[in-house]
Amino acid sequence: DLIGYVGSYPILGVPASLCAFAIGARMTNPRARILLEWSCVPGNAAERLASRGARIISNRDLPMKDTGLFESGEYGTCFLDDDGRMQPLASPVWLWDRVYEQVVRSVLSGSWTQKKEGEAINYYWGMDSGAIDIRLSDSVPAGVRQLAAILRQDMREGQLKPFTTVLRDQDGNVRND
């Protein structure tokens, strides 16, 4: 039930990604508890998470030197085997070509709306946009692969909306409207 998450630094989209990860983890395991370690502090984030009992460790960013994360070049979610080695399970895949294509098409068609200076534009496109997918390791069991395919398809079709739920903090306070 303990899942480790390595965040790069507590700014910008990192906390949002952590929260999204926690929501997804709890969809399949309501007892899931996410343990957080930052890679921006000295030491090995993966070892710290393992010492706290995490056997599943996730990281949304590319491997970073001296964090102990995914020396094989893998990133995403890994399983810590009995020998202490990271075994890849799944990885998010950002399909930037689809994002760029949609942006360029909207500019060329005249549908691009320019925002006021300093106003943020939302580039957090979900699976339904075709800009994000998931890659599963060959070691993932067939039943889990099947479940992942169902969830992927339902998110792409708008049938599953994991982020339209009431979000509560650790004290039970509602944090969204």
Model-derived segments and their meaning:
Residues 1-177:
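A residue-level marker of the well-folded mature domains of exported/periplasmic proteins
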